[in-house]
């Protein structure tokens, strides 16, 4: 994604921070980065657990979201990974505590409110998460179902322009607040 945006001269539009282990700290970090950017348009993109966070942010703030093989019930899926875990990118490790699962539960979105705000990219060959849960959780969302594939969406370059086109869609912004009126 970063490489494609650089090719298009749009690198300044991209931010992909290293996320803290705490889900609540992750949400706070994302919100602070958006506030600091002071941009009128925001689309959050999240893969796996990042898709869960993106869904929370989309519902809380009305932002459009692109979800790449998103986790739907991560507190269930991650309960078997309590304790020290290796970091898959960059080396090192992190410690997953039981309270992290509680934080995830608190961020859950039972159902999305405006499916047109979402673009789901799900791979039927995801070896980590069940794509059918993803499809069921995002009814009505724009969806690309990759036949086969994997959790990392290793062939993402085939979909990056579709993702960018969705991000550039003008009518995904939250509706303007309506003026309250007195009904007689």
Model-inferred region functions:
Residues 41-43, 64:
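Structural motif
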Residues 19-20, 47-48, 70-71:
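Histidine- and/or cysteine-centered catalytic micro-motif in compact active-site loops
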Residues 1-40:
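Active-site catalytic motif of lipid deacylating hydrolases and related acyltransferases
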Residues 56, 60:
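Active-site signature of alpha/beta-hydrolase-fold catalytic machinery across serine-
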Residues 45-50, 54:
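Gly/Ala-rich beta-loop-alpha elbow adjacent to hydrolase catalytic centers
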Residues 64-184:
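The alpha/beta-hydrolase serine catalytic core
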Residues 2, 54, 131-134:
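Short, highly selective alpha-helical patches that border small-molecule cofactor pockets
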């Amino acid at each position: 994604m970063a490489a494609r945006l650089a090719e298009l001269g749009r690198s300044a539009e991209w931010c992909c921070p290293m996320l803290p282990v705490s889900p609540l700290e992750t949400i706070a970090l994302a919100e602070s980065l958006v506030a600091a950017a002071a941009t009128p348009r925001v689309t959050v993109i999240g893969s796996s657990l990042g898709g869960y966070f993106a869904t929370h942010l989309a519902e809380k703030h009305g932002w459009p979201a692109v979800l790449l093989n998103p986790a739907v019930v991560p507190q269930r899926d991650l309960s078997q990974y309590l304790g020290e875990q290796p970091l898959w990118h960059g080396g090192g490790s992190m410690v997953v505590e039981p309270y992290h699962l509680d934080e995830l539960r608190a961020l859950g979105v039972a159902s999305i409110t405006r499916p047109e705000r979402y673009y789901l990219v799900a791979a039927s060959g995801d070896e980590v998460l069940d794509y059918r849960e993803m499809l069921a959780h995002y009814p009505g969302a724009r969806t690309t179902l990759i036949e086969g594939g994997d959790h990392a969406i290793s062939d993402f370059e085939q979909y990056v322009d579709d993702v960018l086109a969705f991000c550039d869609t003008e009518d995904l912004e939250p509706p303007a607040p309506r003026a309250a009126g007195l009904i007689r």
